Amino acid sequence: IPKMFEEISVKTWAYEFATSIGYRNVIVTDENGEDIVCADSMWTLMDMETKHPVRIEEEDAKGYEIEPRYPMEKCGRKIRLPKEFEVVDTVVVPKADIDYNGHMSNAKYILLANEYVEDITCVNRIRVEYKSQARYKEALVIERAIQEIEAEAGMETHVIIKMSGKEAGDVKAVVDYRLTEA
């Protein structure tokens, strides 16, 4: 993680378009030219009137130069949820968290979830699955689960934060924090 006032550079590029989905990488590089943060993201092209996905046409993609995908761990689209969660809070979405699309900004879900991870400095990977949109003044039930997952390199500790509306099954977002050894 860069230190305060350290110069960094950020680069982002598209690496694939498929039906209504665009894939892109983001890399943060320190002042020595070393990659210190990498991200992989999926974006959906939406018709803002119908709120439905639309096909990415050749004309839409023409303005993007496709570059190779950054060599990083490839995660599945869905975060596997544990069976049991503990309800830790209920919060109301403030106006400041609403983006120009009229729903809670994607970045705000992560900032909110960070509040429920005991030691954020032990996190070495964050995965987010956005499921539905939270709106202004909507109450979000915050649930947390801590689980051990067997991986190739051994056991991993994950903190899973689930944010849901008041209705059963109305999950808005799930954030999975993989922790390093303490």
Residue ranges, per PLM feature:
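Short alpha-helix capping/helix-loop boundary micro-motifs
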Residues: 126-128
